[in-house]
Amino acid sequence: MYHKIRGTLCGLALVLAGYLVGLATAWIIISQPRVDLIAAHLDPAYASRQIPLLWEVWDIVETDFIGELPDSRTMTYGAIRGALGTLNDPYTAFIEPRQHQRQMEDLRGSFGGIGVTMRRDKDGHVLLSPMPDSPARRAGVQSGDILVSVEGQPITPTVSFDDVTALVRGPVSSSVTIQIWRGDPPTTHSFTIVRQEIMLPSVTWRLVEEQPDVGYIALSRFSDRSAGEIKQAIGELQAAGATRLIFDLRDNGGGLRQAGVEVASQFLQDGVVMYQWGKGGVEESFGVMSGGLATDLPLVVLVNHGTASAAEIVAGALRDNGRARLIGEPTFGKGSVQHIYDLSDSSSLHVTTAEWLTPKRSRLSGQGLAPDITVVRTPEEANAGRDVQLEAAIEALSK
């Protein structure tokens, strides 16, 4: 096989605009495939018949179509998506360069940027809020500043957040010039800011106020840094007096498979974290890694419909190994495995190749994990700031 395997990942289901998007699957990233070798593997008879047919259609459309034609890249991307659509697999997909870059940054847990959060106001303007001790704050950017342009490109209400983010982010140590409006009436200010590595924390933790010996750990995704952050959380909570733990995996759409194995291993003494079934029935097991920091503390895990992929791996491993009960709602149910090929224009191709199972060999695709204690959190409770699932977790640890 001429591809070089770079690493194995579990899918990241991104949460955008309040719904689950992306590919909650196991991923294997592979280096850029060589076009000449791919062509060499094509059936010559197929190539001689079908590829001219594609160009025949293209030529007719280009000559006779009455409307405005998209650019060639858009047409090519559409043709690729059309071909993949015939596979009837929603997780075999083509990912455009910008989205692929964002996924990789999220999985690394860091990116080159200026350290601002962004949101739109009711008029569609992009409002900035600099992070503490960030390049943007040191340069003079203030909360509420309206982003007008980046490197001379106007930022209007029609420019997508993905496009704005791509303009602001860039290589560490490179510089970017932004222009903002401030005040009423607005005055214009320009800042040239040197980008630095901005961390994307995936873990938050605290002692539960009602039960100060209960530690609460929430994990938003599985990135390169997650296992280290979990270790830090466990260590600090134990030092503060925590003797019981709540592990919150709600709305965690997944991430790196290896991070999932490492995180689960912090709570397990031994055993298997997951099994993977490949093409032809080949099975691979992933065992618990030694050195866990919380292998004997009482533990419960919070899950909901947004718990997917690597988060389901971890939740299933903790339950199947008799380590924790699951509290909340049924999980998303994604267990497919993909190869991800980096393509020549920085886009990527995701191809489903296998699926994974829990330690008791439960399949998750299409069914997910049913909680041991079902607690539904209503929108009214969420809006009122009441977390009945967390309340149930605290109660379960007290029994």
Where are these regions (language model features)?
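Cleft-lining beta-strand/loop regions that shape enzyme active-site pockets
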Residues: 126-129, 137-143, 151-157, 161-344, ...
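Terminal targeting/pro-maturation regions of precursor/exported proteins
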Residues: 2-91
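Conserved P-loop NTPase
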Residues: 338-342, 349-377
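Generic alpha-helical segment signature
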Residues: 47-54, 223-226, 386
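Intrinsically disordered, low-complexity Ser/Thr/Pro-rich tracts
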Residues: 1-9, 21-45, 149-152, 183-185, ...
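Extended, small/polar residue-biased N-terminal targeting/export presequences
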Residues: 62-128, 175-177, 181-205
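Conserved functional hotspot residues or short segments at active or partner-binding sites
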Residues: 86, 364, 383-384, 388-399
